[in-house]
């Protein structure tokens, strides 16, 4: 710009758009729906224009009494891909009707913890229990049988099979169940009906159940994964970076679905690098640093200053 050039900056990250632009054009559905001078608009107005409706001002999170423990992690140790310690004596408890938010800078053991919970990595020590039943490590199917829903951070790599149809992804974890199969023969009508119901219930924008999953937008890919994982009414939900790379409308939708699971009675472990998300959704917040829990705070009493100090690796309690 300083050299006299014009710059077109394309992004759905509204804070960045507001910080560097002089004029803003909003696209929705392939059409220009609004133009604004940056000084004369706000992130709230732009967000509403992007989704074509008024977004909720605040997340409506009901006060709920946490129930019994549904996820217990005890003395968990693990190595990273370089065979260096990634998790060190990690202990966590998640209860019914509760969202436990895990904050931390990327690369402090979050990915390794997610992979262990998803059955993709073995720890070197420790026990994980779901509803008081020990989890068999290295077995994704074991986690599914114990009613754990898994929302991995990379929906295109570990969350979905991109070259399969939407329908195939929706029934992926249950395709061999009695609901969808008899004597090796697929129950096509039942599968079609279930897929159509999930597409409708989760507002998945697609040309149909036979559409190739790769053709969907990021927000709709996340909805497919949510529909598959939450359809079975899980006892535990592991949500790892659930809104990464999504626009504001999709983020709001995902947040509402997570809160609905909390109200239904599930225990949710929310692993996120987005502090706004952690503060908005969590009943309790823990901070992970170099594979260890630095501190814990109740969601309503947590301060950004305290969480930030713990995220930097300083074990210091801020005076309220």
Feature locations, PLM:
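Glycine-rich phosphate-binding loops of nucleotide-dependent enzymes
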Residues: 1-320
């Amino acid at each position: 710009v300083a050299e006299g050039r014009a710059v077109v900056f394309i992004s759905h990250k509204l804070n960045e758009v507001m910080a560097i632009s002089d004029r803003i054009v909003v696209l929705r559905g392939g059409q220009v729906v609004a133009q604004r001078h940056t000084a004369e608009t706000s992130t709230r107005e732009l967000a509403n224009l992007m989704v074509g409706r008024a977004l909720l001002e605040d997340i409506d999170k009901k006060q709920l009494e946490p129930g019994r423990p549904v996820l217990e992690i005890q003395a968990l140790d693990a190595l990273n891909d370089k065979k260096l310690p990634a998790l060190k004596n990690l202990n966590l408890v998640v209860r019914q009707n509760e969202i436990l938010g895990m904050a931390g800078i990327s690369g402090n053991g979050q990915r390794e913890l997610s992979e262990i919970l998803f059955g993709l990595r073995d720890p070197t020590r420790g026990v994980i229990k779901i509803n008081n039943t020990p989890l068999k490590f290295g077995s994704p199917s074991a986690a599914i049988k114990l009613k754990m829903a898994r929302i991995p951070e990379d929906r295109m790599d570990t969350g979905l099979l991109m070259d399969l149809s939407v329908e195939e992804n929706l029934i992926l974890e249950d395709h061999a169940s009695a609901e969808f199969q008899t004597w090796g023969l697929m129950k096509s009508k039942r599968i079609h009906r279930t897929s159509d119901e999930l597409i409708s219930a989760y507002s998945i924008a697609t040309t149909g159940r036979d559409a190739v999953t790769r053709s969907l937008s990021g927000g709709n890919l996340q909805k497919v994964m949510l529909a598959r994982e939450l359809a079975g009414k899980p006892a535990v939900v592991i949500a790892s970076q659930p809104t990464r790379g999504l626009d504001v409308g999709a983020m709001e939708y995902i947040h509402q679905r997570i809160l609905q699971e909390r109200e239904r009675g599930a225990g949710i472990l929310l692993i996120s690098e987005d502090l706004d998300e952690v503060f908005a959704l969590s009943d309790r917040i823990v901070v992970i640093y170099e594979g260890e829990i630095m501190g814990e705070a109740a969601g309503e009493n947590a301060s950004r200053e305290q969480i930030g100090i713990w995220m930097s690796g300083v074990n210091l309690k801020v005076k309220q």
